[in-house]
Amino acid sequence: MPRADRKNITETALIEERAVTAANSIPQGQPVVLAAAGTISLPTALTDQIYGIAYKTEDGTWPATGGDFVEVILIGSPAIVPCRVGTAAGVTAGQIVNVDGGWDGVKNITPGVANVTTPIGMATQTSTVTGELVGVNLGARLGTGT
């Protein structure tokens, strides 16, 4: 592809509108899954708003444990952010992680839950109304977690 035809990934992010299923309140930044008839719902056991995928460690060794730095790809975003493992539990390559409060000026991560249902992207706005359309950023899709 000629260089002039290439676009930054943030310029070409695929946003789709999906209706929220009944009994779901979906906050902005929440990973979401496809439900019946093209609607979206909350993934099983994924409740925090910011999730990512453990991508790379400083020294290339896994698992990363408490205090280690890990680069994390944020779900639904092309962003890769440096985070520090906030617990003694090991984080493995490709694992879904929770990105939570600050620790020494950087974000903590803790091992996420097993990937019970696969998020398709991240909600771009908040919805509390059944059937309301919300944007879903499909920029980063997950494979299977560990």
Q: Model-flagged regions — what are they?
A:
Residues 1-146:
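Glycine-anchored, exposed beta-strand/edge motif detector
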